[in-house]
Amino acid sequence: MLNLFRQSGLRFLWLAVVVFVIDQVTKHWIVANLEPYQAIQYTSFFNLTHVYNYGAAFSFLSDAGGWQRWLFTGIAIAVCGLVTWWLKETTRQQVMLPVAFCLIIGGALGNVFDRLLHGFVIDFLVLYYQDWYWPAFNVADSAICLGAFLLVIDMFKNKDNVNE
């Protein structure tokens, strides 16, 4: 078992733990220091705003009546299981792919924890330009997006290696 851990992408699981902890610490700080919907402007394009997201990305299905909490929790847990299995299948030589998987796992578990504990996800990072606002997000969402981006990069990197 230890050999499998050392020889596969499972050796990067610490990154998922780091993402989860940073996500939860930042959310705890927001809850402790900002009232719901209170904003602190830092620049002309960025602020911290304490908001609750009852839906998925971009508040998808946020007003669906509560059942979506369990749907999104179930999907996230299933995805984490699948991605962990894929992580186990990676080789020692692969780095970008297991890092991407662990970013996704850590972010997904951070949001699952919120859904189970609160019934919603705490978002607080807001980017905007004049009257155009990107939907609020959090560290977990950022890790998931970065992981997905790295998956795409890895896919094209491996495509180039196969064609040579």
From Swiss-Prot:
Substrates-to-products reaction catalysed: Release of signal peptides from bacterial membrane prolipoproteins. Hydrolyzes -Xaa-Yaa-Zaa-|-(S,diacylglyceryl)Cys-, in which Xaa is hydrophobic (preferably Leu), and Yaa (Ala or Ser) and Zaa (Gly or Ala) have small, neutral side chains
InterPro entries: Peptidase_A8 (IPR001872)
PROSITE patterns associated with the record: SPASE_II
Keyword DNA-binding: no
Membrane topology of this protein: Multi-pass membrane protein
GO molecular function: aspartic-type endopeptidase activity
Ranges annotated as spanning the membrane: 12-32, 70-90, 93-113, 133-153
Active site: D123, D141
Cell compartment(s), UniProt: Cell inner membrane
Primary subcellular site in the record, as a coarse category: membrane
EC code(s) of this entry: 3.4.23.36
A Gene Ontology biological process term: proteolysis
Assigned keywords, A-Z: Aspartyl protease, Cell inner membrane, Cell membrane, Hydrolase, Membrane, Protease, Transmembrane, Transmembrane helix
Cellular component GO terms, alphabetical: plasma membrane
Annotated metabolic or biological route of this protein: Protein modification; lipoprotein biosynthesis (signal peptide cleavage)
UniProt key word Calcium: no
Similarity comment: Belongs to the peptidase A8 family.
Annotated function: This protein specifically catalyzes the removal of signal peptides from prolipoproteins.
Annotated protein name in UniProt: Lipoprotein signal peptidase
Native source species: Pseudoalteromonas atlantica (strain T6c / ATCC BAA-1087)
